[in-house]
């Protein structure tokens, strides 16, 4: 198995399960955290490792280290030459995860995908039917689809993020520090901000479309985050996927551990305050784009690039929280008519949108 993004939250959970169940990690890749990478090297003895930052190469305790100077394509090609068609877990953060997803499928790897930007920006160029999704909502949908009648509607849930109980007028002045306090999940900084703006849920709607080919997809607020997904079927029945807020379950199913005891089941008697609410579109304006992205999934490239660029500006205290959405809508005004017919155009538009957003 090849693990991309080994030092992140998902990557560490994959490593935990691999260690617990004796699964070999043949190759590891991360961005800059060489200390965590070295720790994983000592535990798993991988054949190849990759660290994005070339300046850190000499700090990695391994004889076969690839960096951005070589390119992650070369790293994956070396892995394929050595291991053949194995599983690639892509848990990289951001748009940088798209190219490894494309390359992995072209080489013939089985793709287990936690990198949502791969689908948001490049879903039309991926074989989505062969992807194992590592995301609580999409894993929940996949689980519910097994041996079921025709689907009428899919529903995913959102916690509402860090600012759900805050008045709209207060959002202009919130800080990155306060935005990172997610009520239920422990996640990386970028996805936690996306949860607070509801960009994460917009992306997950588009991911669900690419994965399952259904446009009748909605999202509702469910504050406990224990109900991850629901499906309404043509026969009038609705099923829900309920589990603890722990990504190990989705990971386990993606790597063949579905028969193992991964999590303690939720105590059903403890579920006393479950309720669903619609998403407040005034408070979360980015979610007004749901119909637009389902009708024109190419818009995902623009929204993702603008959002990603502005989230990091917000985390660096360069802009206000509400500037994230403002930049997304202005980027759509400027680039929204673009047609994307090939992979190269995805990367070209991404670059242009980021340059445009640097002016904010």
From Swiss-Prot:
Positions that bind Mn(2+): 135, 137, 204
Gene label: dxr
Organism expressing this protein natively: Campylobacter fetus subsp. fetus (strain 82-40)
Reaction catalysed by this enzyme: 2-C-methyl-D-erythritol 4-phosphate + NADP(+) = 1-deoxy-D-xylulose 5-phosphate + NADPH + H(+)
Designated name of the protein: 1-deoxy-D-xylulose 5-phosphate reductoisomerase
PANTHER family on file: 1-DEOXY-D-XYLULOSE 5-PHOSPHATE REDUCTOISOMERASE, 1-DEOXY-D-XYLULOSE 5-PHOSPHATE REDUCTOISOMERASE, CHLOROPLASTIC
Cofactor: Mg(2+); Mn(2+)
Annotated NADPH binding sites: 7-10, 115, 117, 188
Family membership noted in the UniProt record: Belongs to the DXR family.
Gene3D superfamilies recorded: 1.10.1740.10, NAD(P)-binding Rossmann-like Domain
Enzyme Commission designation: 1.1.1.267
A GO BP entry: isopentenyl diphosphate biosynthetic process, methylerythritol 4-phosphate pathway involved in terpenoid biosynthetic process
Keyword terms of this UniProt record: Isoprene biosynthesis, Manganese, Metal-binding, NADP, Oxidoreductase
Any one Pfam family match given in the protein's UniProt record, by short name: DXP_reductoisom
Single annotated GO MF: NADPH binding
InterPro entries noted in UniProt: DXP_reductoisomerase, DXP_reductoisomerase_C, DXP_reductoisomerase_N, DXPR_C, DXPR_C_sf, NAD(P)-bd_dom_sf
Classification of source organism: Bacteria, Pseudomonadati, Campylobacterota, Epsilonproteobacteria, Campylobacterales
Uppermost EC category: oxidoreductase
Ligand binding (1-deoxy-D-xylulose 5-phosphate): 116, 136-137, 159, 182, 195, 200-201, 204
Function in brief: Catalyzes the NADPH-dependent rearrangement and reduction of 1-deoxy-D-xylulose-5-phosphate (DXP) to 2-C-methyl-D-erythritol 4-phosphate (MEP).
Functional pathway: Isoprenoid biosynthesis; isopentenyl diphosphate biosynthesis via DXP pathway; isopentenyl diphosphate from 1-deoxy-D-xylulose 5-phosphate: step 1/6
